[in-house]
Amino acid sequence: MSVAILLSARRRPRPRLALLLLTLLLIAASLVHLGLGARWIAPQTVLRALLEYDPRNFEQRIIVDLRLVRLAAALLTGAALGVAGLLLQTVIRNPLGEPHILGLNAGASLAVVATSALGLSFGAFPAGRPLTAACGAGLLFGGVMALASAGRGGATPLRITLCGVALSGFASAVTAAILILDEQTLLAMRTWLAGDLAGLNWSTLQTALVPALIGLGVALLIAPRLNVLALGDKVALGLGVNLVQTRLLGLLAIALLCGAAVAVAGPIGFVGLVVPHVVRRLVTEDIRLALPLAAPVGAL
């Protein structure tokens, strides 16, 4: 048996062990979070509220009606941004790639703010805000890739990053201009733009969960091709990988994940940058193993 096979055999338990530890940490952190707040609630009361809910108990109502929905929103947002960050860094082959830096969050925010300023309501179509945010993120990142691909040399990681920062600044400026000119939109969106989990309900989370799950499914579907893509375009072409299709599917997954996260909690940065590096320390560069771990790490 070769050394490579021995090393791979030794590494196999690591992703499972890491997933188990992350799950336990996530459960413990969630229980602590549900007890924290303006009114401290003991862990045993939190467990009783989750297992044997009594609507007549005031503390249990605080947990189930207020804190639980915020916890679910935080978990969904962190998991979506973590997976999106890992996927983005893999697609563009840049360890500094992050939805906030490359303009996806800014594009999603601009789309939501613009539709609100135009008076378009999301009430008749509950999934409207997540899909609008996803379209905004996808369009702006598509513009980043098109701008970075222009000229000689193609879309190098450095050019993608520079174009992303430039278009992100432009989208943020347009968003600020809309808010300055429309006071009603400013009042409706100012807390959301700062990154806020207050005022959410289960209906909002359910509609945001659909694009997030679709994005995760697409990411897992193209994970084997992304491993080959990480070796370089020439190698990937030689092994029969359709580069355009793979990158478009990756863009679709990233846009859906970012759209779901932004629709719930507003534009939040840094999570998509740090999570991929943490995951790579826990497992290998294999995207098939890293993707399932990016969600709990981001949620934490």
Outline where the language-model segments fall.
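Alpha-helical transmembrane segments in inner-membrane proteins
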Residues: 2-300
